[in-house]
Each structure stands twice: as C-alpha cells, then as structure tokens.
A protein has these predicted regions:
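Conserved SAM/SAH cofactor-binding pocket of Class I
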Residues: 1-57
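Conserved Rossmann-like nucleotide-cofactor binding loop
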Residues: 29, 72, 99
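Short strand-turn motif at the edge of the Rossmann-like AdoMet-binding core
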Residues: 93-98
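Conserved class I S-adenosyl-L-methionine
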Residues: 99-109
Length: 131
C-alpha cells in the first residue's frame, strides 16, 4: 500500500486474506496513525515503513501493489513498483483525474504493464494493470 495514509487499503487487503502486507508513506504522522489503525482493527502481518518508493527496494515480489497518490508521484515511482512485482502481479493506482489516464497508461506500458480497466467517479480515476 504505497502512500498508505491511514493504511485503510492495507487493512482491508489483510482482512480479505492478503498476507503479509506492506504499508509505506513518506509522512511520519501517517506511519504512526497506520500503526494505531492496524492495532485498532486487530490485524497482523502488516509492516509499516516511512519513506518513498525507494523503501520498496529489496521487498517483494508482491502479488498486488496499491498506490493512491497523485499523478506526478505515480509517474515517477512506477518503475519502482514494477521492480517489486512478478509476472501476473496486479497494480492498482488512483489519486488522479480521468484526464491523466493516457499519461499513466503510457508510462505503465513502458514498464511492461498491461492495462486491464479503469473506474471513474466525479472525474477521479482508478486503474488496474497487470505485469
């Protein structure tokens, strides 16, 4: 869960059977809040780290990567997401506008990702790719 914020996505993934899970955020408050939320929800096997996408180095491979961050960070960090994935891994990204999908898609395809689909709500977009 990149840009985990409160770690709600990592917590949900863990509750649905994913394990182990990793949650990373650049903000110290988010890391502290994530740890608290994980404890409040009674889940285990979620490792929380403070940092940017470089914190992924040496981790994985992951079956699923979730990133809910702005467009520019997603474009910049996508190479690092792919580096911790394996063939068949899924990448879900959100936090950008529907108009940004072509740029996100071009960058993803440069890194060997295949576009699966997108969803839109109030001009906000979420996309799914597979490696």
């Amino acid at each position: 869960d990149m840009g985990c914020g409160t770690s709600i996505l990592a917590i949900l993934a863990r509750m649905r059977g994913a394990k182990p899970c990793t949650a990373i955020d650049i903000d110290e408050w988010c890391v502290r809040n994530s740890i608290e939320n994980i404890e409040l929800n009674g889940v285990t096997d979620i490792a929380v780290s403070q940092g940017d996408a470089s914190a992924l180095q040496g981790k994985g491979p992951f079956d699923v990567v979730i990133a809910n961050i702005n467009r520019n960070i997603l474009l910049n960090d996508m190479k690092q997401y792919v580096a911790c994935m394996h063939p068949g891994s899924e990448l879900f990204m959100s936090g950008f506008y529907i108009d940004d999908i072509p740029a996100i898609r071009r960058e993803a395809e440069k890194h060997g990702l295949t576009f699966v689909h997108h969803q839109e709500k109030n001009r906000w977009a979420a996309v799914k790719f597979v490696l």
